[in-house]
Amino acid sequence: MTGKKRSASSSRWLQEHFSDKYVLQAQKKGLRSRAWFKLDEIQQGDKLFKPGMTVVDLGAAPGGWSQYVVTQIGSKGRVIACDILPMDPIVGVDFLQGDFREELVLKALLERVGETKVQVVMSDMAPNMTGTPAVDIPRSMYLCELALAMCRDVLAPGGSFLVKVFQGDGFEEYLREIRSLFTKVKIRKPDASRSRSREVYIVATGRKL
């Protein structure tokens, strides 16, 4: 019975995916993923990216966000990206493949950042979903906490943090923690996010000293 349910669910997801207007637009425009459109909508409203910025992209593969950011920060900007999965090269993006949860990978990522203070840390990280919120939400929140810890290490005063969060246990506490560190915090649900998904994006600007 479980297998049948999973098969039906997978088939439904595939049908939704390939008929999704953002997926179709991404394919037509030669974009890495539909995530490009999520970030574009956030940028139109919140103006996170400017020419010359240094940006850290966590959970970067297949590269939709990095691909978008390089169009905003220009040739003098820099994107440092990391993902456990491989990612095809993008001009202007320094990509590190590895598990961000591992100490050696985090150390290598921090070495690539160097002494430069980062203007934006963004995380589109998500665990492998089981479909069980009691399992998926804690795993997701753990990744969100790691992304916030990265902010503490590298984000410049006045910098911004963008993170994907799945609403559930721990969400309000995490939101309070972010509000204690940034002057302005908003919750966004871009049109390109699937309506039935629990995902939202926290946009935090003005990192406090």
Curated annotation (Swiss-Prot):
Positions of S-adenosyl-L-methionine binding: G63, W65, D83, D99, D124
UniProt KW keywords: Cytoplasm, Methyltransferase, rRNA processing, S-adenosyl-L-methionine, Transferase
GO MF annotations, alphabetized: rRNA (uridine-2'-O-)-methyltransferase activity
Gene Ontology annotations for the cellular component aspect, listed alphabetically: cytoplasm
Pfam family, one: FtsJ
Subcellular compartments: Cytoplasm
Main location: cytoplasm
Alphabetized SUPFAM superfamilies for the sequence: S-adenosyl-L-methionine-dependent methyltransferases
Keyword Cytoplasm: yes
EC primary class: transferase
Enzyme Commission code: 2.1.1.166
Residues annotated as the enzyme's active site: K164 (proton acceptor)
Swiss-Prot/TrEMBL catalytic activity: uridine(2552) in 23S rRNA + S-adenosyl-L-methionine = 2'-O-methyluridine(2552) in 23S rRNA + S-adenosyl-L-homocysteine + H(+)
Similarity comment: family membership: Belongs to the class I-like SAM-binding methyltransferase superfamily. RNA methyltransferase RlmE family.
Protein name (record): Ribosomal RNA large subunit methyltransferase E
